[in-house]
UniProtKB/Swiss-Prot annotation:
Protein name: Hypersensitive to pore-forming toxin protein 40
Organism: Caenorhabditis elegans
Predominant location category: cytoplasm
Biased composition (Polar residues): 332-346, 413-443, 617-634
Feature: compositional bias, Basic and acidic residues: 638-662
Stretches that traverse the bilayer: none
Domain Tudor: 138-203
Gene Ontology cellular component list: mutator focus; perinuclear region of cytoplasm
Ranges where the record places region Disordered: 332-351, 413-448, 472-492, 617-672
């Protein structure tokens, strides 16, 4: 593979990752793609903890190749060395003489076993086969691969690539790589022209003394700590006498899953600590190996002790589960069937806080219709078993409290007392266990009850519903009129709730709301806007397209030119039709990632909200009214052509002036108080939207005449652009009313962008006038 072919593969792979917008696992790539990703560190970023590649966000042009640079070796590149470590035949646990060489992520320390000698015939065999060696191409060098380093006098050594060293803007033969010898204790930077490849002398055929290991108790180290650890190793390695003498390390075991040795050795800094303790002290670890034994102390390592291993938090999956089979001394009463789960720890005292809280929670979840005629004692008995004496005490206390709080007549009091007599108590308990509805239903009913005018007028029933949550009604439920229903609602207050109410408590009163019999009509008119005016994310709002363009123009993001695909040359900017189509019909899918999800939702929701006409509702009219933004979807320029999903040209969408006579095709607000051309003093901000004092006087004396002069002044401008400006101004007003500052700013920016693109001066003046009027609405957010 030459340099051009390598670049073509890298460019194609980068484009695929960019379009995917997600990391790619190394296992999902074929061998050629793995080599490409490992060689182009300038384009692809590798995460050794997740073993995946991501594209570095940058601008790439196919005509401008990027120079490759080999990335640093990772644990995933050491397959051959791991297999060599798994075949190591030494007693474990034991002490061996090692020399640490290099540390890499997630956590592997390359250690050289000084006790293991190289193969006897390896050196002679490589000297005899030196004539068959060949220099590898620059595209064949990958991290972790084994090569043969050959000196000038003919001596050959096996080594692996650790990283690329030096400048990459040099000829291939002069490139330098940091290599580690696998048969000698040596790390050196060599040139590419001194490296050779051969089909013989693999690690599988000739085992080496370089092994993969990790420190006991630590499964992964932090990314920022590996550079400091390599600096400690380098300082130890630079001293030749230390490198040759090595140090004693204790081998705990061989991790068969990771194919690495679990070792520990004294600190390389000379402190009285072990390496595992030193890493933990510096918080250099990221993941802890919980299955490893407890590490030895520094004194035990110096004395070369081999104690019995100890494990922390050892949990065997196959061990027996301890069960509590001891029978309790207390005898439990057979509980009554109930849908509420009971707990033995909460049933100790029926008057305790836990029991009361549980009974209250159960009553809150009961439907309103199921609690008619039930007293607090029957509800208490249906929740958990209690004795009859306790029920009678609760009944008496409940009756006395209700008499004080609600002023119920003696006859109704006697009828209530007869309902909970002991002879009928069992029947009440058996029938008081209805199916509990979902919590969402109760919450919805509660909100409706709070917001309904009927609940505001009915103060006593509302108080009972807020305390006991049993009188929740829909807004259209008729108000209770009989005294019997009132007494019945108040009888549903439980013991612990009614005790907190006294006769001198005042019921809070809210301002009365007149009851209305009208219903707001829902507009059922289908949208007539072309496909290009609709929200690319699924919503019908057209401001998303303008917001997208505004954000993309501000950030100068051009995704279509990301990988060298140039945009077609533009036409004359003075052409109105081209300007408008380029501004509105350009596909928006390329810019979709720029918008935030919250911006999309706020913009779409505020552009399509339906505001009923209050004046027509007050008059009793049932004629449907449309929101101001419905006109945005119904307005389209004459030169816009609709295309299907494949890009085929479809029938052009034009506007017929006769359509305005259709009563169903409502395009603007019919409220005479709201003027589309000029915002009057009736606006929400209590301000006028005229630039000069003279115009202010005209608005105060005669707004209609001023609006008529404005209409005549801009009679020659394009009807489509005029309606678009009016509709965007309505959208700004709607955003100001709803206090949605994001949608407010986005619509104003969209108007400013369009005003700069329109070709005619009369159009520019009209758009600028609308922008000035819209800007003054910002006072609503003060």
């Amino acid at each position: 593979m030459n340099s051009q072919q390598e670049w073509e593969h890298a460019y194609s792979l980068a484009e695929r990752m960019y379009n995917k917008q997600a990391p790619t696992k190394r296992e999902e790539l074929n061998p050629t793609e793995r080599v490409i990703c490992s060689r182009f560190e300038t384009i692809f970023d590798y995460d050794p903890f997740k073993d995946e590649y991501t594209f570095r966000d940058q601008a790439l042009l196919f005509s401008t190749p990027v120079q490759p640079k080999c990335r640093t070796v990772a644990e995933a590149d050491l397959h051959e060395l791991k297999e060599n470590t798994a075949k190591l035949n030494i007693p474990m646990p034991s002490y061996i003489n090692i020399c640490p060489i290099y540390a890499l992520l997630p956590f592997t320390v390359l250690v050289f076993n000084n006790s293991q000698h190289a193969h006897k015939s390896l050196s002679d065999d490589m000297e005899r086969a030196a004539a068959t060696f060949r220099n590898p191409h620059e595209s064949e060098i990958v991290p972790g691969a084994m090569y043969i380093f050959k000196q000038k006098h003919g001596k050959a050594y096996r080594c692996i690539i650790l990283s690329e060293d030096g400048d990459m803007n040099i000829p291939d033969a002069e490139r330098k790589y940091l290599v580690a010898f696998i048969d000698n204790v040596q790390i050196v930077s060599v040139k590419q022209k001194t490296l050779f490849v051969s089909d013989q002398f693999s690690i599988k055929d000739y085992p080496c003394a370089l092994h993969c290991a990790r420190i006991v108790g630590i499964s992964a180290i932090r990314k920022s700590y590996v550079s400091g650890m390599n600096q400690f190793i380098l300082n130890f390695y630079d001293a030749k006498e230390k490198r040759k003498a090595g140090m004693f390390a204790f081998i705990y075991k061989l991790d068969k899953e990771e194919k690495k040795l679990v070792i520990d050795y004294p600190s390389l800094l000379g402190t009285p600590k072990t390496t595992s303790t030193e890493i933990r002290t510096a918080v250099g670890h990221q993941i802890v190996a919980s299955k490893d034994p407890v590490s030895l102390t520094f004194e035990q390592l110096n004395k070369k002790e081999v104690p019995e291993f100890k494990y922390l938090n050892s949990t065997d999956d196959d061990s027996d589960v301890e069960l509590d089979l001891i029978e309790h001394d207390t005898k439990s009463v057979n509980p009554v069937a109930s849908s509420h789960p009971t707990s033995s720890s909460m049933d100790d005292c029926p008057y305790g806080r836990a029991s009361i809280a549980r009974a209250k929670d159960y009553q809150l979840r009961l439907p309103p219709h199921s609690q008619k005629g039930l007293s607090s004692s029957s509800l208490l008995g249906s929740s958990y078993p209690v004795s009859n004496s306790i029920k009678n005490d609760i009944t008496k206390q409940s009756e006395s409290n209700r008499a004080d709080a609600t002023n119920i007549s003696f006859s109704s009091f006697e009828s209530t007392k007869s309902d909970i007599s002991p002879q009928n108590n069992q029947n009440v308990e058996e029938t008081s266990t209805p199916t509990v509805p979902p919590n969402s239903t109760i919450q919805e009913n509660e909100e409706d009850e709070i917001m309904s005018p009927a609940s505001i007028i009915r103060a006593p029933s509302r108080l009972a519903g807020s305390l006991n949550k049993v009188s929740i009604e829909r807004p259209n439920t008729p108000l209770p009129t009989s005294s019997k229903n009132s007494e019945h609602n108040m009888s549903e207050i439980s013991t612990y709730e009614a005790s907190s109410i006294s006769s001198h408590h005042l019921v809070p009163q809210s301002p009365s709301v007149p009851k209305t019999n009208y219903t707001v009509p829902v507009v059922q008119r289908p949208l007539t806007a072309p496909e290009k005016f609709r929200d690319p994310f699924g919503g019908p709002g057209s401001s998303d397209i303008l917001n997208t363009k505004m954000l993309c123009s501000e950030k100068n993001i051009v995704p279509s030119n990301k990988f060298g695909r140039q945009i077609s040359p533009g036409k004359d900017d003075k052409n109105e039709n081209y300007q408008y189509s380029r501004m509105e019909t350009k596909p928006q899918t390329l810019f979709a990632p720029v918008l935030d999800e919250n911006q999309r939702q706020s913009s779409s929701s505020n552009m399509m909200c339906q505001i009923p006409d209050i004046s027509s509702v007050a008059q009793g009219s049932n004629a449907p009214k449309t929101a101001p933004n419905d006109s945005v979807n119904s307005v389209a320029p004459d030169d816009i052509h609709e295309t299907d999903k494949r890009g085929n040209h479809c029938k052009s969408v034009t506007e017929d002036p006769k359509d305005n006579k259709d009563p169903t095709a409502v395009t603007t607000l019919e409220d005479p108080d709201i003027n589309d051309e000029n915002f009057s003093v009736q606006s929400i901000c209590s301000e006028t939207f005229v630039e000069t004092d003279q115009k202010l006087m005209e608005v105060e004396t005669g707004a209609d005449a001023f609006t008529e002069s404005i209409t005549d002044q801009f009679a020659q401008m394009s009807e489509g652009l005029k309606k678009l400006a009016i509709n965007l101004a309505d959208s700004v007003r709607t955003a100001a009313i709803e206090k949605n500052h994001d949608a407010f700013i986005a619509n104003i920016h969209a108007m400013e962008i369009i005003s700069k693109k329109v070709p005619d001066d009369i159009d520019k003046r009209f758009w600028k006038m609308k922008i000035v009027e819209a800007r003054k609405l910002e006072a609503a957010f003060d």
